[in-house]
């Protein structure tokens, strides 16, 4: 927002230099991006009177002028403008002056043999326009005097601050809002425009119907006998300084109120509205748009309205996009003599939805989206009416006000001095000592922004927030932030916060997550992070009600899809196979509601080795057992043993090389090789493996008292006793099931179980396979004897026969 310093000083009596004021505003959250000091644009440029104009003796397109500039003698100036002539008032840059807009310093020079002692300026040379057809000529009736500075005449006696508010506040987009901030920062006197509210008749020629909850206040004022003309020069200059193009006096006044109060207004041509409605008595409505309705807006765009858009209607025909832009069919033109002045409060979300549905953002919508101050709406309306009657003439015929809320909102917050000092800490005193903020400081700072403080207890206030700050001052912490902002963040001392007994400690859950990440990195996996937002495509997905992009309008159902995409992207970029893992949240919907859960996923595959020269350059892709070993190693680091069982529930995996993972009877997740058709379709290596685990189940097993403290076990110094166990068993029985029974029956003496042979084929019964295990028995305190080992080993053998009907071979 561009702020005229002269205009600002009419509202708040601040005499700080622009640079000092800009620094204060920036530190208070109103970042001044540029200081445009227009006073330098015309320094040394004065009003001159062209006394004589003669043709240059050596150039057809040059003129030699005698110009009076308030000195003892006229000066000679060679001018190339085609519109220069005698007896006109012009802007003259005198010798020694510097024009920054064209980077030119004036000095005596000769043009085609004639001495020139200055320059007659165009508006572009003074920075007021981009292009000029000739020199600027002042009106004859302007009461000018030769030698007077041109700055005040052209609006070049001002400084413009281009600032951006970092806070989501509508009042920050108005001159009065900035003036209030300056008053709070500098203790300067605030002088707001004097507005005396008037009561106007309410005639049946105007009826207003609020059919949407998104509009709680709407007033329409009918003014007859207005004259459309250019705005006065002072009004045009203020709008131009703010970067707003001037249209005519009526539209310019509504824009002026927009800048001054931050309240968007809109002026309709009443007679055009009557023609649209087909009646002399207007029925203005506020409602949601209907499917298929269209509206031609002021930018000459024919727009098809979304059902979510909020519209203003006349006779139920859309005439404006509420809070965003008016309609072209009812705009004010040179022939307009009757106005309907709209002043309304629209719900911020509704305006944002309307603007977004049309891809349209305007000065009005920017303020409505932040929430304008409904309590100052009558004041802004009256201010606009006063200016309209003063500048455009006319008479107020009728005013109709429709509201859905009868009481003004009241908002009060309990504020504790102790809490303020706990959060903000001490401030730097003048003697460089640190001290806490006092009650007087708090009352002074908050009163300066319009708050009313009532002391209800020792250093405890009930703070009534001013209406223009209702939307951003809602809690105690908001007021504390205001105290810090107004006092100045740089005025607080450097101290450490008080530490409690458990400050700085990680929660058990976070500590375990970090351990999991460290172990995964230790086995060669890179941590990945993907967006939770994905393309829609499943009924089980949770869809966003108001997405930024259609491609990211749903929440992810799993981590696996993102991991596969990442593997494919890295492979296509020539980065080789990706070994990665991700910890994140997934979301899904069911008939009884929405759900979310934390998951851990991983992907690996291809040939990660670098010794291909030893294999004649051939790749050696990781196989199922090696990939499975990576996952097992992760769990072994935590002292956990997982069980693999056949699984065919996910068609993205190979049906014969996929397993569900179980941890002490709890389903943990799934691991397997990606389906060959999926890899072929995506151009991936033939063997890519992935897993997705339920992180909550994993953490529950890790969050056990016996696992919180590391346990160390010495190596046995006594020899082991090995036994081989071979048998035929049905192919439906998994090795995991067999190993579980073997370990259970082997008890404490059985230290290791290893499958070292599997055979299917000749001499093996049909639908069976031959398996051979090596069992290692060991004790930590003695050498085991045959008498100790054999009974245990026989118990293992017998259990396998009874449980799985195996045929023992050894």
Curated annotation (Swiss-Prot):
Entry superkingdom: Bacteria
EC number: 6.1.1.20
Keyword annotations of the record: Aminoacyl-tRNA synthetase, ATP-binding, Cytoplasm, Ligase, Magnesium, Metal-binding, Nucleotide-binding, Protein biosynthesis, RNA-binding, tRNA-binding
FDX-ACB domain sequence ranges: 716-809
Root EC class: ligase
SMART domains for the chain: B3_4 (SM00873), B5 (SM00874), FDX-ACB (SM00896)
CDD domains: PheRS_beta_core, tRNA_bind_bactPheRS
Catalytic activity reported: tRNA(Phe) + L-phenylalanine + ATP = L-phenylalanyl-tRNA(Phe) + AMP + diphosphate + H(+)
GO BP terms in the entry: phenylalanyl-tRNA aminoacylation
Sequence ranges assigned to domain tRNA-binding in this UniProt record: 39-151
Cofactor(s) this protein cannot do without: Mg(2+)
Subcellular location, record wording: Cytoplasm
GO terms assigned for molecular function: ATP binding; magnesium ion binding; phenylalanine-tRNA ligase activity; tRNA binding
PANTHER family linked to this entry: PHENYLALANINE--TRNA LIGASE BETA SUBUNIT (PTHR10947:SF0), PHENYLALANYL-TRNA SYNTHETASE BETA CHAIN AND LEUCINE-RICH REPEAT-CONTAINING PROTEIN 47 (PTHR10947)
Family to which the UniProt record says this protein belongs: Belongs to the phenylalanyl-tRNA synthetase beta subunit family. Type 1 subfamily.
Matching NCBIfam families: pheT_bact (TIGR00472), YtpR (NF045760)
Subunit structure: Tetramer of two alpha and two beta subunits.
Name recorded for this polypeptide: Phenylalanine--tRNA ligase beta subunit
Organism encoding this protein: Synechococcus elongatus (strain ATCC 33912 / PCC 7942 / FACHB-805) (Anacystis nidulans R2)
């Amino acid at each position: 927002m561009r702020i005229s310093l002269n205009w600002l000083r009419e509202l708040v009596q601040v005499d700080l230099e622009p640079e000092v004021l800009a620094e204060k505003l920036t530190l208070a959250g109103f970042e001044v991006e540029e200081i445009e000091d227009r006073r330098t644009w015309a320094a040394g440029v004065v009003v001159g009177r062209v006394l004589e104009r003669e043709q240059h003796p050596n150039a057809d397109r040059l003129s030699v002028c005698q110009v009076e500039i308030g000195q003892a003698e006229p000066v000679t100036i060679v001018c190339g403008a085609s519109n220069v002539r005698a007896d006109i008032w012009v802007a003259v840059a005198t010798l020694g002056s510097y024009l920054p807009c064209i980077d030119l310093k004036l000095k005596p020079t000769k043009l085609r043999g004639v001495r020139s002692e200055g320059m007659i300026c165009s508006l572009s040379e003074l920075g007021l326009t981009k292009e000029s057809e000739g020199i600027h000529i002042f009106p004859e009736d302007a009461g000018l005097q030769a030698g007077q500075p041109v700055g005040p005449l052209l609006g070049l006696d001002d400084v413009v601050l281009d600032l951006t508010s970092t806070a989501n506040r509508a009042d920050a987009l108005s001159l009065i809002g900035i003036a209030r901030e300056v008053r709070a920062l500098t203790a300067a006197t605030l002088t707001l425009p004097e507005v005396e509210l008037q009561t106007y008749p309410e005639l049946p020629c105007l009826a207003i119907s609020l059919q949407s909850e998104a509009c709680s206040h709407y007033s329409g004022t009918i003014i007859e006998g207005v004259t459309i003309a250019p705005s006065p020069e002072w009004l045009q200059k203020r709008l131009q300084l703010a970067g707003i193009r001037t249209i005519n006096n009526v539209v310019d006044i509504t824009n002026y109120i927009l800048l001054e109060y931050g309240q968007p207004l809109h002026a309709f041509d009443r007679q055009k509205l009557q023609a649209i409605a087909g009646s002399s008595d207007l029925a203005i409505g506020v409602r949601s748009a209907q499917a298929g309705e269209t509206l031609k807006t002021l930018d000459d765009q024919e727009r098809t309205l979304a059902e979510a858009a909020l519209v203003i209607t006349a006779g139920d025909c859309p005439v404006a996009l509420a809070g965003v832009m008016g309609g072209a069919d009812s705009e004010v033109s040179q022939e307009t003599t009757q106005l309907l002045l709209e002043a309304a409060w629209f719900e911020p979300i509704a305006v944002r939805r309307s603007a977004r549905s049309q891809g349209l953002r305007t000065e009005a919508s920017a303020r409505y989206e932040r929430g304008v101050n409904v309590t100052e709406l009558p004041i802004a309306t009256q201010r606009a009416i006063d200016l309209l009657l003063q500048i455009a003439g006319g008479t107020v015929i009728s005013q109709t006000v429709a509201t859905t809320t009868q009481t003004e909102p009241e908002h009060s917050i309990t504020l504790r001095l102790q809490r303020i000092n706990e959060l903000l800490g001490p401030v730097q005193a003048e003697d460089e000592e640190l001290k806490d903020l006092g009650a007087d400081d708090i009352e002074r700072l908050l009163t300066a922004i319009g708050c009313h403080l009532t002391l209800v207890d020792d250093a405890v206030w009930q703070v009534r927030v001013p209406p223009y700050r209702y939307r951003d001052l809602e809690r105690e912490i908001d007021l504390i932030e205001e105290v810090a902002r107004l006092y100045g963040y740089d005025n607080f001392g450097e101290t450490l916060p008080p530490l409690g007994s458990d400050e700085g400690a990680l929660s058990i859950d976070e500590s375990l997550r970090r351990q999991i990440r460290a172990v995964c990195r230790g086995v060669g996996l890179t941590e990945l992070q993907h967006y939770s937002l994905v393309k829609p495509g499943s009924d089980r997905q949770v869809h966003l009600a108001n997405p930024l992009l259609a491609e990211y309008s749903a929440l992810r159902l799993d981590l696996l899809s993102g991991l596969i995409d990442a593997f494919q992207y890295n492979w296509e970029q020539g980065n080789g196979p990706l070994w990665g893992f991700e910890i994140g949240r997934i979301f899904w919907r069911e008939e009884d509601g929405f759900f979310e859960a934390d998951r851990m996923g991983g992907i690996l595959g291809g040939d990660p080795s670098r010794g291909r020269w030893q294999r004649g350059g051939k790749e050696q892709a990781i196989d199922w057992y090696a990939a499975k070993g990576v996952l097992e190693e992760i769990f072994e680091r935590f002292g956990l043993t997982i069980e693999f069982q056949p699984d065919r529930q996910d068609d993205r995996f190979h049906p014969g090389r996929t397993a569900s993972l179980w941890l002490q009877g709890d389903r943990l997740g799934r691991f397997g090789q990606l389906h060959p058709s999926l890899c072929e379709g995506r151009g991936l290596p033939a063997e890519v493996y992935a897993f997705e685990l339920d992180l909550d189940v994993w953490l529950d097993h890790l969050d056990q008292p016996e696992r919180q403290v590391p346990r160390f076990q010495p190596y046995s110094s006594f020899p082991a006793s090995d036994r081989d166990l071979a048998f035929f068993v049905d192919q439906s029985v998994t090795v995991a099931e067999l190993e579980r029974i073997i370990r259970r029956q082997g008890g404490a003496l059985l230290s290791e179980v290893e499958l070292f042979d599997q055979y299917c084929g000749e001499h093996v019964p049909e639908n069976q396979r031959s398996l051979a295990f090596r069992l290692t028995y060991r004790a930590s305190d003695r050498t085991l004897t045959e008498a100790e080992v054999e009974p245990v080993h026989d118990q293992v053998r017998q259990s396998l026969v009874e449980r799985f009907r195996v045929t023992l071979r050894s």
